[in-house]
Structure formats: C-alpha cells, structure tokens
A protein has these predicted regions:
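Surface-exposed binding/hinge segments that line
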Residues: 197-244, 263
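Ligand-site clamp/hinge motif
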Residues: 283-329, 485, 494-496
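A structural "hinge/loop" feature
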Residues: 107-124, 147-148, 174, 196, ...
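Gly/Pro-rich hinge or "lid" segments in bacterial periplasmic/extracellular proteins
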Residues: 128, 231-295, 305, 313, ...
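Append "and occasionally in soluble cytosolic enzymes with long acidic Gly/Pro-rich linkers
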Residues: 277-282, 358-486, 576, 630-631
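N-terminal lobe/hinge region of extracytoplasmic solute-binding protein
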Residues: 105-155, 186, 257
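Aromatic- and charge-enriched surface segment that lines or borders ligand/interaction sites
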Residues: 6-7, 11-45, 149-194, 215, ...
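Detector for C-terminal structural segments
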Residues: 2-38, 369-403, 475-485, 506-634
C-alpha cells in the first residue's frame, strides 16, 4: 500500500509539471502578442512616455506598487546623496578679483623710471609693479620670459634675440613693440641720461628688425647678460620728446606709464610736498595671467618704528621689510614670509675721507678686532650667517680665503703698535671725556656715554686714531654699530657714530660718498658678478663700489670673468679676485641675512622662496589674492 502511494505521488508530480509547461507555452504566445502590441504603441523608443506611465498602477498589484515606490524613493535618495557628495568633494575655493592691499615701505619715491631706479629701493619696488621687462624672476628666483614670448642665444653667446609677447600693451592702450625696447636701450646708452645701467650696455648693439623682434649683439660673451634683462621697458611714444639732459625732471618719473600688472593711480603729498602714499590700480589688459588684487597702496615712512606702529594700528596691512629681531604681536592676523636673498652686510672703508684708513695695518687691525659671532648674537639672536667675502657660500666662484669669524684683538693691538700708533693713557680729569662716544643723527650731535670708557687712545705724528662709523637708523643696525664702537675702542680706536635715516642714506651719504666707514648691505643678485661692486670704474656715483676700491689686477679679473660662460674659468677668476680682495682689506664683510616680509593672514598666493632684490617680493604679484569664490572642479 505504501509502495503504491509513493509511485502515485511521483506520477502526480510529473503530471503537474506537464500542465505547467503546457500553460507556459500558451502564456508565451499571449505574452509575445502583448509585447508586440506594446512596442507598436510606444514606437521605436521602446520606453513609455509620461502619459503611458500613469497606467502602470492599473497593471501593478498593491504589493508591486509599494515595492516600486520604495525603489523609486531609494533611487532618488541615492542620487541626491551622490550629488551632494560629488559637490562637496569637488567644490574648491579659487582666487577671485577684488580686494585692496596697503603696505608700509621705508623711504620715499624719487624716480620711478627703470633707467634711474637702481639706487633707490622704493623706486625699484614701484617700477617692478608698473613696468614689464624682457625677463623676470619666478617665485623660485629663476629667470623666465616676461615681455618676451621666447628668446634665442647664438652658439657664440654674443647675440640674444627676443620675440615679444603679441598681447603686450601700454597702460594708455597703445601697443608695445620692439621699437620701445630699442628706444629704452638707446636711452641707457645715451650718457646724458646718466643711467646706472650705462656701463652694462655701452658696447651692446641693439636692433629691431620687425615689430616683435629685438636682438642684442655683444662685442664679446657676457655670462650674466640674461640676468640684466630684468630692467623695465619705457614707452617711446611718451619719452621720445623728452630732452635726455632733463629727463630726470620729467613728470613721467612720478606718474609712470608702463606695461606691468599695475598702473599708476595717484599719489598723496603732505603739506611739505613729500609723497606719503602711492596708489596703483589693476591693469585689466595685462598680457600675463591675473592680477587678482584690485588696488595696491604703498605708504612711506622714515623709520621702521613708524611703519610698525602703522601696522599695529591698522593703517597698513603689511610691511615691506621686517627686521630679524621683530615679531608681530598678533600672529593670528599676520604672516611672516622669509626669502633667501643673495645679500651681505659689510663695513666699507672710504680711504680718501680719513688718512688713517689708508694704512692697511689699521684696516686689518679693525678686521681682527671685529667679533662677528658676537655681533650676530647681539643684533639678530644668532639668526645670520657670518661671511668672509663678497661671493656667498653656494654661489658660483665662492672660495673661502680666510675664516669668516677670525677674532683676535691681541693681534690687532700688536699690528697698531708695530705701525707706530702709540698708546696714550687719558689723564684722570679727562677720562670721562675720553670715554664718551659721540653719536650724531644727520648733522645733529647727540653725545652719549659709551658703554665702556676708552682704556687708551692712539696717536701718530700728533694725529689721533679716530674715525666716524655711519649706519642707518634701524634697531639692528644701531646695535651692530654700537657693538663695533665698543670693540674698536677696546684696541684704542676712537669711534664716533653717525646714525642716518633710511630715507636719506642714498642722497646724503652714498651718492656723495660722504662717510669714513659705512655699515651697509649690498644685494649682489642671482649671478655673483662682482663687477658693479668692486671694479674701479664703479667707484663714483652711480656706481656701487662703496669702498672706492681700485686695483688694476682685480679689474682685469672681473672683466675676463664676464667674457666667458665657462663656469670653471669664471670660478678660477673669482677665486683669484677674492684672494686679492682679502689681502687688500678694502672692507670688512660681516654677515648675510634672510629677507623677512610681513603681510596680513588673508593675503594668499605668495609662493616666493628666493629673491635677488627686495623688489622681487612682487615677482608673482599677479598670483596674489584676497577674495575667493567657490567653483566645482572635477
């Protein structure tokens, strides 16, 4: 009975399968007919339109309809979440046009003209913003094309050909052409202009074969030639009628028309006629990218203390230079940028102004009595590099001819003794007077007591061994000067200090070479070419040979080094130059500093790492921004 029931069940199972297959076949025929009907209705698109979709509810069961609604909701929610996620992950802040920036600068403008600006840092600052140049520095201190779209150098390295950017225009709307470059160089070569660039271009032949091409032909190779192509170009159509002999008096020197990222807006004078503010506006037709910041204002101050007070009061947003010892009080609102700068500070001897300085033994004794590490610790908290010569470590041709920190006051005293400078002990009643150090600011004597009384003075042929040390009125510079005074008076040299305002140092002191010993910094640029600073032809203004150094052998070395692009040959010439300079002691090389720049925290885009001159802090000014806007970026 059981066996029968089992087989009966199996038979029933297969019968049910057969019935299902039969029904499926019938349904298949019906379904095919339905599909054909639907496709015929909806056409080739094979997707129902909105009118047809509303009938879906008539074919769905309640359960199927619920499932469809849930699926549709999940699909919409997922799409929305994915969209929000993509938006958040790809939404970035981009620089936007707008904003204003005001910067405090020490000094005042005089000639905002590329032909004259080399002797005034303020002029160079503004010229960098207003004028375009064939070459410029990028944020890493490398030379890149600016007004030049490209350039070529012939195999002999004597012909440089530049092709100008086709979109370059002057701020007055006129197109910039090769004729403007030709006119600018010919003006430099005209001695009536008295441009400091004359020496560099006096033997250069310049041609403009067409509107966009200009070529320079040198009499012989000049290795640093590309680096001098950073001078600004003047508009011929505005300067061609200006008498070269009176060019320095032209109104265009204070209301310049250039081709750079910013154009002249206006300047503000005080009641005495001194320019206190200089306002620049974004040039919308600038050939390069940017700029973003709408308005720039430079405000001028006589000292860093005044500039810093203006920063703390909110009168300015930044300061063009921040001394090493200074730190902003509110670091949340300020950013300090430190740039590598090829610069050294030295003591330059003007032997013509003080007979005692003509003696090499005196100059060498002063050098041996100079404690560079002590000076760096006192003035900069140790944050400076002691140097021994005019070519800095890491630069082409650097050669350490002697220790950068040699300090031997005992040997210094012996040198002076052997040179006939006799020690004179001051009388007791005159001791106080002998120990007083004289400090002058400008032409005003302030007479202050020295930190230490002179242990003795020195005389030779009834002449006292005394000198005047001139320094700029800035805290760190004054500390250095006072430290030097104490060190030198320790070996019997009487020292008077002359502290001069930064704004007048060029005009009143450097230009007429009105100093005996000058504490001053020199910026040597990317190429270490010492010619502008140590060749005898540069001893007088507008040259930069502040020691008035003259040595025919050195002149020949510097001239030969300029004529070759071979690095090994240049290094050999520079090594011989440094050896001779070390033997002659025309100056005492002290230290090299980084360049610190103070800006507001909301000023972005400053990517500069290396500069060759303080004005190069504006090298990527077109990338700076204050305002931002949100954009999607995939």
């Amino acid at each position: 009975m059981i066996r029968f029931s089992f087989w009966n069940s199996i038979a029933g199972y297969f019968q049910s399968i057969a019935k299902k297959l039969s029904r499926r076949a019938e349904h298949s025929l019906t379904e095919k007919t339905d599909q054909d009907f639907v496709f015929e209705v909806i056409g080739e698109k094979r997707f129902p339109n909105a009118t047809q979709l509303k009938y879906l509810t008539k074919f769905y069961s309640p359960t199927e309809l619920l499932i469809s609604k849930i699926a549709l909701f999940l699909a919409l929610a997922s799409s929305l979440a994915l969209g929000i996620l993509l938006y958040q992950n790809n939404l970035v802040r981009k620089p936007a046009e707008g904003g204003e920036y005001a910067e405090a600068v020490i000094g005042a403008p005089t000639y905002i003209n590329p032909l004259f600006a080399q002797t005034n840092d303020v002029d160079q600052d503004i010229a960098r913003l207003v004028f375009g140049s064939l070459m410029k520095l990028d944020e890493n201190g490398n030379l890149v094309a600016d007004l030049a779209e490209r350039y070529d150098i012939d195999p002999l390295a004597t012909t440089y050909t530049f092709t100008l950017h086709p979109g370059a225009r002057w701020h007055d709307g006129e197109p910039l052409s090769a004729q403007d470059v030709l006119f600018t160089v010919q003006s430099i070569q005209d001695q009536s202009f008295k441009s400091p660039l004359y020496v560099t271009f006096r033997n250069v032949r310049v041609q403009a074969p067409d509107e966009r091409t200009v070529s320079f032909t040198l009499a012989e190779p000049f290795a640093p030639f590309l680096s001098v192509m950073t001078f600004g170009i003047l508009p011929e159509h505005l300067w061609q009628d200006v008498d070269p002999a009176h060019a320095i008096l032209a109104e265009l020197n204070l209301k310049p028309v250039g081709s750079g990222p910013y154009r002249f807006g206006q300047f503000v004078k005080d009641k005495n006629g001194n320019i206190k503010e200089y306002r620049l506006e974004r040039f919308d037709e600038y050939y390069g990218p940017g700029p973003f910041i709408k308005d720039l204002t430079l405000k001028f101050f006589g000292s860093f203390e005044e500039a810093y007070a203006a920063f703390e009061s909110g009168n300015v947003d930044g300061i063009g230079f921040l001394p090493q010892h200074q730190t902003p009080a509110n670091t949340d609102q300020a950013a300090v940028h430190k740039f590598s700068l090829p610069q050294y500070t030295a003591l330059f001897f003007n032997q013509a102004a003080n007979p005692a300085l003509k003696e090499k033994e005196v100059r060498l004794a002063l050098s041996l009595a100079t404690d560079k590490r002590g000076i760096i610790d006192s003035a900069f908290g140790g944050d400076a590099l002691p140097v021994a010569g005019p070519i800095l470590p890491g630069m082409l041709g650097y050669a350490q001819t002697k220790s950068a920190t040699l300090f031997d006051p005992a040997q210094a005293e012996k040198l002076l003794d052997d040179a006939g400078w006799k020690r004179e002990r001051p009388e007791s009643e005159d001791a106080e007077a002998a120990g007083a150090a004289i400090v002058t600011r400008g032409s005003t004597t302030l007479g202050t007591q020295g930190e230490e009384q002179l242990p003795y003075t020195r005389t030779k042929n009834n002449a006292e061994l005394a000198l005047t040390l001139t320094a700029i009125q800035r805290d760190d510079s004054i500390i250095v000067a006072e430290t030097l005074r104490d060190l030198w008076q320790g070996i019997g040299v009487k020292v008077n200090l002359n502290i001069v305002e930064i704004a007048s140092i060029q005009k009143d002191i450097i230009k007429p070479r009105a100093y005996e010993v000058l504490l001053f910094g020199q910026i040597i640029g990317k190429d270490p070419d010492p010619y502008p600073f140590w060749h005898s032809s540069q001893a007088n203004d507008p040259g930069l040979n502040l020691a008035l150094y003259q040595n025919k052998a050195v002149d020949a070395l510097l001239e030969d080094a300029r004529k070759t692009s071979d690095a090994a040959t240049r290094e050999q010439k520079y090594a011989a130059f440094q050896t001779q300079l070390s033997q002659d002691v025309p100056a005492i090389f002290l230290y090299s500093l980084q360049y610190a720049y103070l800006t507001p925290e909301n000023l972005k885009g400053i990517a500069t790492e290396r500069i060759n001159h303080p004005s190069d802090r504006f090298a990527n000014i077109a990338s700076w921004y204050i305002k931002t806007k949100k954009r999607l970026q995939f």
